[in-house]
Amino acid sequence: MSIDKSYCGFIAIVGRPNVGKSTLLNKLLGQKISITSRKAQTTRHRIVGIHTEGAYQAIYVDTPGLHMEEKRAINRLMNKAASSSIGDVELVIFVVEGTRWTPDDEMVLNKLREGKAPVILAVNKVDNVQEKADLLPHLQFLASQMNFLDIVPISAETGLNVATIAAIVRKHLPEATHHFPEDYITDRSQRFMASEIIREKLMRFLGAELPYSVTVEIERFVSNERGGYDINGLILVEREGQKKMVIGNKGAKIKTIGIEARKDMQEMFEAPVHLELWVKVKSGWADDERALRSLGYVDDL
């Protein structure tokens, strides 16, 4: 009697902030797991997205963008999370943006050169490159930087060539037992996903200054008798002025954030959600490693 083979492995998605790593992960999984926003520092946790297709299970580690800037405790911890996820995977997807190449990209590349895992280079946002003639020389420049397993021009937004990446990933999964049941898409709890959804909406609806100094704590997450969930979210900011910004004129801003977050939660949890949000000032949390640990920023380091 023959036993069917199964394949399973970990894949890190790395790159500097804002190159489209989370969008790529969401496309590879076919749904939204990692929060996406146009602001740097959106992904703060190593979210694991799981894609199971028949005998193949790919477990994606979505790293925070690696930063040159290491001043604040939160940035140091984010860099540590990104670096540690490179070390223990079968394959790395290194995401860069179009024809842009920055010192941050160079820093990520140097970390990858030290690693043992093969690296796929995903050149994202190629549909946004104005001068198409610049693309080929840039790809040749990238190819000369490291012995990449493959170089794939993609658009994570539209899905262009994302299937190519998925096929390469499948080909490099080692023979192994699946780590998760096939219907799992993430190992994060619903409570964690709720806080991520609220944080995404904060980023989407607020100015550039705020995201660096805001976090979300879920104080209550319970099933109710209506077959849904009652969720209380506490939004922590560093200054009184930021609290006013989050609440908005006569509470308009926080109301919008709550409505949009509730829609996403209901879609993700497939159940009605009653959501209440509060805003509280907790100064200096982004500089305090103890506070960060209590908020779950180093739960996997």
Curated annotation (Swiss-Prot):
Write the signal peptide boundaries: none
Per UniProt, GTP binds at: 15-22, 62-66, 124-127
Q: Which InterPro entries match?
A: G_ERA_dom (IPR030388), GTP-bd (IPR006073), GTPase_Era-like (IPR005662), KH_dom-like_a/b (IPR015946), KH_dom_type_2 (IPR004044), KH_sf_prok-type (IPR009019), P-loop_NTPase (IPR027417), Small_GTP-bd (IPR005225)
Q: Which keywords accompany this UniProt record?
A: Cell inner membrane, Cell membrane, Cytoplasm, GTP-binding, Membrane, Nucleotide-binding, Ribosome biogenesis, RNA-binding, rRNA-binding
Task: Name all KH type-2 domain ranges.
Answer: 206-283
Q: Name one GO cellular component term.
A: cytosol
Major subcellular location class:
cytoplasm
In this chain, the stretch annotated as G4 covers 124-127
Q: Which GO terms describe its biological process?
A: ribosomal small subunit assembly
Task: List the residue ranges of the region (G1).
Answer: 15-22
- Residues of the region (G5) are 154-156
Subcellular location as annotated: Cytoplasm; Cell inner membrane
Q: Which residues form the Era-type G domain?
A: 7-175
Function comment: An essential GTPase that binds both GDP and GTP, with rapid nucleotide exchange. Plays a role in 16S rRNA processing and 30S ribosomal subunit biogenesis and possibly also in cell cycle regulation and energy metabolism.
Assembly, in brief, is: Monomer.
Sequence similarity: Belongs to the TRAFAC class TrmE-Era-EngA-EngB-Septin-like GTPase superfamily. Era GTPase family.
Name the UniProt record assigns to this protein: GTPase Era
